Amino acid sequence: VSGTGAAGECRPSLARGLWALTYRELKKWLKDPVTLVMFVLQPLIWMGLLGKSLNIGGLFSANIISLPPQVPIPGDAILHPPGLQGVVLNGEALARMFADMGPGIMKGAFGVADYFSFMAVGIVSMIVVTTTMFSGMSIVWDRRLGFLDKVMSTPVSRAAIIFAKILNATLRAMFQATVILALAYLLGLQLSPTFTPLNLLGVYAAIFLLSVGLSSIFIAFSIRSTRIERPMHFVGLITMPLMFSSNAFFPTRLMPSWMQAVASVNPLTYLTDAIRQLTILPLDATALLWDFTYLGLFAAALATIGIVLSWRCLTR
């Protein structure tokens, strides 16, 4: 206990209140098998159907590159030796040459030779965002069902109520990211030679920072609502712009300049890049340090704003 009031009532410590409320949230989630199955099926469908069907590397295969048996080259296109009237190239050999260039083109564009590995990490980031936001939505049901009022009438700290929601969202995001990475590996995710199990700690740290920031601000938005439709519309409004204005599914350097500017301030860009650096790309310590610096500043700023706003709502 943290102390005794004038009436002799024991006030639970912040840690005990935090544990009790977090345990309640996780227990509800783990006891709902339908929700657990859906959380696994959703990324599996994205990776199994969309990830495998978007075989961008296959565009460079010899079977796809269609060239005539003979490819004439005019003389004015030949620099050396000079004076040739023209040459005729073997179309099949030329197609094989282009196919051999495919992995290099893919690595130059995506950093990896297969698009599935690139996209699988993007799906991890996407699921982290959606899980974090939807986890904060449970506070709307707590308010509608009267549970929030009951908790607020007890000696439990208001901070424990807020931190429990944030911790629940973060733990769920980490759990789902682990499941998605395991499924992606089974489906063909190619890990970098520099990958070690310790890299997973960095992955969890990056997910933790983004989840804390997003869940804090989303809880502050949802805590004032008694209708579930409002936060659901909010999630639908910002999820797609966050995903498609980041590097989750497409490299930022191939985007238009105005979208590159948007991606440069999108926190999802830095989460995705950090996870890729730690899993499928050769480790770039400078880039990774910048990713964590941005995510840390993002988490600190949004967590401060979100917690202060939620605190004011609970204490007024």
For each predicted feature, which ranges?
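Junction motif at the cytosolic side of a transmembrane helix
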Residues: 2-3, 57, 279-283, 292-316
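Short, membrane-interfacial amphipathic segments enriched in basic
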Residues: 2-23, 214, 258-269
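Membrane-interface helix starts
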Residues: 23-42, 289, 315-316
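Hydrophobic alpha-helical transmembrane segments of multi-pass membrane transport/permease proteins
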Residues: 31-59, 96, 117-131, 176, ...
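Transmembrane helix segments
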Residues: 48-60, 222-265, 269
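Hydrophobic alpha-helical transmembrane segments of multi-pass membrane transport proteins
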Residues: 72-99, 108-187, 218-219, 237, ...
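Membrane-interfacial helix-loop-helix junctions in multi-pass membrane proteins
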Residues: 85, 103-114, 194, 243-301
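Alpha-helical transmembrane segments and their short interhelical loops
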Residues: 158-235, 285-307
